[in-house]
């Protein structure tokens, strides 16, 4: 039993736009508040981490890639305003996206790229684009704007990675940590 022809094209276009990270009319505006949605991206990130853990001494990058620190000081996080949390999440997503694009370039320039690594890098890029779109629909601002009641936002802590294993571990930890904490709080505040 298939999808009627009159619905097939709109569904296909919707899935295409979502995979590109573009907003889709008719998409539930708070889809990220459904825990199953975020868990799907976390699961994909964890799979990529698990695949690359077996090759800890696998391909190294020619240069180190900058990624966000994923450690969370829960006391400091709880005292931050949701706007400050949003800034930290956007900065982290931006660093991750840039690092994963650099990893994609490493694979593209490799003489024998691993199809499995390429698949997980492509999924990570698609996932980050979709998460960006879902966060915009939640009302999170992409621009790292300092909240009006603070004079300055503490810059996001960063460090560097030199392997796919470390990159995917950071990606997985960031989604399970800061992103999940932020969306949980933003969704709760939006329900009030």
From Swiss-Prot:
It comes from the Eukaryota. SUPFAM superfamilies: 4-helical cytokines. Its main location: secreted. It holds the Pfam family EPO_TPO. One of its GO terms (cellular component) is extracellular space. The keyword Signal applies. It is found in: Secreted. Coiled coil: none annotated. The keyword Ligase does not apply. Glycans are attached at residues 50, 64, 109. Residues 1-26 form the signal peptide. Keywords: Disulfide bond, Erythrocyte maturation, Glycoprotein, Hormone, Secreted, Signal. GO terms for molecular function: cytokine activity; erythropoietin receptor binding; hormone activity; protein kinase activator activity. One of its GO terms (biological process) is positive regulation of cell population proliferation. Disulfide bonds join 33-187. Belongs to the EPO/TPO family. Hormone involved in the regulation of erythrocyte proliferation and differentiation and the maintenance of a physiological level of circulating erythrocyte mass. Binds to EPOR leading to EPOR dimerization and JAK2 activation thereby activating specific downstream effectors, including STAT1 and STAT3. This is Erythropoietin. It comes from Spalax golani.
């Amino acid at each position: 039993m298939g999808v009627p022809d009159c619905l097939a094209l709109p569904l296909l276009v919707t899935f295409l736009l979502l995979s590109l990270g573009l907003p889709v009319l008719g998409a539930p505006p708070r889809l990220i508040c459904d825990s199953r949605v975020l868990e799907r991206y976390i699961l994909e990130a964890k799979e990529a981490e698990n695949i690359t853990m077996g090759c800890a001494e696998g391909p190294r990058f020619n240069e180190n890639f900058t990624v966000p620190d994923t450690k969370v000081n829960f006391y400091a996080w709880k005292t931050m305003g949701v706007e400050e949390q949003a800034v930290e999440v956007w900065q982290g997503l931006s660093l991750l996206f840039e690092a994963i694009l650099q990893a994609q370039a490493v694979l593209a320039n490799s003489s024998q790229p691993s199809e499995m690594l390429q698949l997980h890098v492509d999924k990570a890029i698609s996932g980050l684009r979709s998460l960006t779109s879902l966060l915009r629909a939640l009302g999170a601002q992409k621009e790292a704007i300092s909240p009006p009641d603070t004079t300055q936002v503490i810059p996001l802590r960063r460090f560097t990675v030199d392997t796919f294993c470390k990159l995917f571990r950071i990606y997985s930890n960031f989604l399970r940590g800061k992103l999940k904490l932020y969306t949980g709080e933003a969704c709760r505040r939006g329900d009030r």
